[in-house]
Amino acid sequence: GNVGNSLALQVAEDPHAVYVIELSSFQLDNMYDFKADIAILLNITPDHLDRYNYEMQNYVDAKFRILQNQTVEDAFIFWNDDPIIAREIAKRHPEATLYPFAETHEAGVKGYTEDKKIRIETSNGTFTMEQDLLALSGTHNLYNSLASGIASKLVDIHDENLRASLSDFTGVEHRLEKVARVRGVDYINDSKATNVNSCWYALQSMTTPLVLILGGTDKGNDYSEIEELVKKKVHALIFLGVDNTKLHAFFDGKVPVIEDARSM
């Protein structure tokens, strides 16, 4: 996926009992014998539609290949409130044992928040932790913590190790990565946010006025998803795309300042 390290190289050089792999839809398209002991789908939103003939279902089918070959002995962890995932589960009836997570407690949910704590319930026991001790902020990182917490309990990670990891994890490069502060302005690199939904979560986590750089290659994006957050939080937009026509068509007149740029 986006991590960039070869799984085959990791296995060849330094074998471990457990491997955590990020798999892109591009990789899943060509995987047939692979089976995940624990598969995780955080959400599904439009992305890479230029690769999938601008048909959302084709992209969804690719993402759900992560469940191929799973049995009841395997686990499928997913966000319970994602409408596309819910629809596909009802249609596909996965063989894997289901471990949904949600922000609030619902019937059957294995990870949720309650009384300002995260709570994870599996056959290996119950784990709780104060929500304000999580190292990473934002709703998306709460979901990430719940999903990774369920997976950790399923492989029997000790509670003290899980708690330590969730409280001191520093994040990864290019994902809301704080690069520098210059004259009171924070510069944040979120270049891994390659779709509109990722941008929504980034904007949702911000608490100060923003200058937002948008660009790249349009992949069938629907910018209405971030329209209200842009109006509310963004002071200036800088377009850094191959073709900014669609960006201008949607955002012109909606923020005080809009500029085009050719490079960082």
Tell where the protein language model's regions lie, with residue ranges.
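Short beta-strand segments
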Residues: 22, 43, 79, 213-214
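Short conserved AdoMet
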Residues: 33, 71-72, 93-94, 207, ...
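Inter-motif core of Ras-like GTPase G domains
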Residues: 33-43, 203, 207-212
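Short beta-strand-centered segment that lines the nucleotide-binding/catalytic pocket of NTP-utilizing
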Residues: 1-6
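ATP-dependent carboxylate-amine ligase
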Residues: 153-158, 164, 168-172, 178-186, ...
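Residue-level preference for the first positions of well-ordered beta-strands
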Residues: 18-20, 75, 209-211
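Acidic, Mg2+-coordinating active-site environments of NTP-dependent enzymes
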Residues: 8-16, 37-187, 248, 256-260
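Switch II (G3) loop of P-loop NTPases
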Residues: 18-26, 186-192
